[in-house]
């Protein structure tokens, strides 16, 4: 039996690099050789035991790779050696939710959020992709892994916060938390034409990045009363749309208080424990406010559209990948990411350490990055 290297969840606060069986595709499935993946905040929740997955599962849900093997029925759609990504959400395209356009809630046997949740994920040398016809998106020529590695989850999720909030041209928008998802939500607000974009975070370095990604005002809650400032800037009303991108009671409550009557709070955070909406924050339920939640849209067409924005220079996500590690060094990488050290935003993982070494060697020689259009 062929084996591969993978990071296996063993139980709360315990992951290990192990040799496990390499997957074999059935009809309609594909096996990818993973070239790049990342660590996500949801992975931290899983390892800490805050989100239930079974011990023995390979986690990770942001795959970039090369097609290693195709199951029957895919020969005319893809080819071995083709560079592709798959979304963190893998819709089947046939169930009630898929047919009604809510792909993230797919109820297909292997649809919805499955990678690193109910089926083996991307922290491995190889990944089995179900319903490959609906989920594998070819990477456009000229794009590197680092250009697109955030498309499967972070970019799609952040952008969906702006989409679900139904931001209109000229709206005022406040984005609470400027981590990778919040920064992509800030970018989404800019792309949708918001006139006032307020980035909120307690980390000044992240606020500086928020300005680059579209915020024209930034607020640090350690220095100002954020809700009062947002209301002051919006003639006392509050923002038309607020986006909560952290998943904590405090940020959810502040976002709610900063949302004007008739406005929308778009919630992107993954919450654990009880979430409370104080009655005065929702004007005793009389303010015509909307609270919407969303899980990152996936599927082949969503991935194609996200990569199109990158390939045309409309979007540059490379600055969000701040650290790189070999998959073998997952413990060091996970500790840095989970403890938010060294200005980390996103950590890229490389199952093939030689590829990472070659990248570092190129950087040491002063290899020039491709020129990008300004945001």
Tell where the protein language model's regions lie, with residue ranges.
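Glycine-rich cofactor phosphate-binding loops and adjacent beta1-alpha1 units
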Residues: 165-169, 192, 208-290, 351, ...
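Glycine-rich beta-strand-centered segment in the early N-terminal region that forms part
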Residues: 21-37, 50-99, 140-142
């Amino acid at each position: 039996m062929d084996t591969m290297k993978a990071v296996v969840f063993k139980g709360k606060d315990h992951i290990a690099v192990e040799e496990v069986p390499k997957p074999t595709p059935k009809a309609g499935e594909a096996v990818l050789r993973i070239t790049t993946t990342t660590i996500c905040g949801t992975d931290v929740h899983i390892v800490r035991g805050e989100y239930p997955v079974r011990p023995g599962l390979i986690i990770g849900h942001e795959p970039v790779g090369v097609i290693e093997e195709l199951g029957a029925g895919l020969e005319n759609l893809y080819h071995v050696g083709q560079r592709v990504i798959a979304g963190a959400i893998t819709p089947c395209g046939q169930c009630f939710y898929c047919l009604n356009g809510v792909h993230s809630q797919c109820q297909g046997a292997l649809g919805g959020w499955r990678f690193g949740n109910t089926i083996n994920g991307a922290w491995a040398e190889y990944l089995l992709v179900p319903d490959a016809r609906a989920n594998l998106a070819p990477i456009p020529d000229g794009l590197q892994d680092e250009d697109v590695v955030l498309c499967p989850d972070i970019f799609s999720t952040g952008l969906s916060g702006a989409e679900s909030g139904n931001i209109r041209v000229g709206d005022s928008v406040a984005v609470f938390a400027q981590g990778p998802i919040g920064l992509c939500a800030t970018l989404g607000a800019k792309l949708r034409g918001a006139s006032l974009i307020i980035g909120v975070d307690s980390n000044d370095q992240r606020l500086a990045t928020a300005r680059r990604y579209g915020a024209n005002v930034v607020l640090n809650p350690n220095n100002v009363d954020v809700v009062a400032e947002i209301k002051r800037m919006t003639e006392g009303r509050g923002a038309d749309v607020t986006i909560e991108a952290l998943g904590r009671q405090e940020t959810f409550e502040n976002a709610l208080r900063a949302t004007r009557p008739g406005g929308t709070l778009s919630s992107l955070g993954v919450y654990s424990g009880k979430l409370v909406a104080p009655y005065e924050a929702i004007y005793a339920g009389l303010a015509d406010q909307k609270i919407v939640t969303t899980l990152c849209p996936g599927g082949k067409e969503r991935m194609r559209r996200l990569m199109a924005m990158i390939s045309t220079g409309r979007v540059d996500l490379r600055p969000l990948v701040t650290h790189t590690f070999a998959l073998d060094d997952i413990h060091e990488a996970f500790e840095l990411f989970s403890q938010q050290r060294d200005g980390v935003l996103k950590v890229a993982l490389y199952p093939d350490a030689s590829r990472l070494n070659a990248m570092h060697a190129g950087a040491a020689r002063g290899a020039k990055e491709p020129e990008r259009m300004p945001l």
